[in-house]
Each structure stands twice: as C-alpha cells, then as structure tokens.
Amino acid sequence: MPGYNHVNRLVSELGEIGTKTQYLFTIGLVLTTIISIFFNIGLFRICKKNGLNIIPILILWTFSFSVLGAGIFPYPLRLHGLLGSPSIILFLSPLAALVFWKNTVIAHIKVISLLTLIIMMLGFLVFLPDFFSNYLGLKQ
C-alpha cells in the first residue's frame, strides 16, 4: 500500500475495502486465527497435564475470535471494530496466570506473565488521543 507507515497508520488500513492489500491482509488474519487455535489447544493440553487452571488460556481465545472477525469484516465496516474488540480483554490472560498459577512446575511462568502483562498494558495508550497523537500505529 503506497504511503503506508506502520508508525502512524492503523494496521487495519492494510485490509481496508478496496486496497490492493485487502485480500492478502484477510488471508493473513485467517491464517493467524488458525495458528492461534492450534496454539491455544496446545496450551490447554499443557495446563491439563500440569494441573494448571485453564482460565488464562480461555481468555486467549478472545484473540482468535477478534482476529477472525477483523479479517472477515474488513475496515471500515462496523463489524470490523465490533468483532475485533473482544481482544481488549486479552491483557487479563497474563493477569489470570499470575493469580491462578501461583504454584506451578513451569519455571519462570510468573515472571513471564508479569512481563507480558506490562507490555500488553502499553496497548491501552491507544485510548489516550493526546499521547503520541501522530503515532497511532505505534500505539496500536
């Protein structure tokens, strides 16, 4: 897409209706959904095997759902935003891991969960319009 810049433009603009990259973007999102489903299934099995609570994994399913919705309904359709929005609770997954996985056999999972939570919380900068206002893509 000519003139596109990841720093100041929305990622969804790559899949916007009528762009040359629309179908490539959609295929990428659908493939991402499929891969994330297999990833979630694997994590679910690991949790069951190690006796870990599955709530953090169930929250991860919001990502799969959101990416699929954003891919099937391209920007600027209303459903693009609506079906893409469940991923806003994705940050709850590492938070739930910190709460529910207190005693685990998986080394360093609490540290990794905390670091992941901190990084994911940076995504909420997108809701502060005056903070880095020219860098919407970077905040996203």
Protein language model annotation of sequence segments:
Residues 57-71, 118-122:
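Small-polar-interrupted transmembrane alpha-helices in polytopic inner-membrane proteins
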Residues 6-7, 73-83, 130-140:
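Interfacial helix-loop-helix junctions of multi-pass membrane proteins
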Residues 27-39, 89-99:
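Hydrophobic cores of alpha-helical transmembrane segments in multi-pass inner/ER membrane proteins
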Residues 63-105:
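Membrane-proximal helix-loop-helix units in multi-pass membrane proteins
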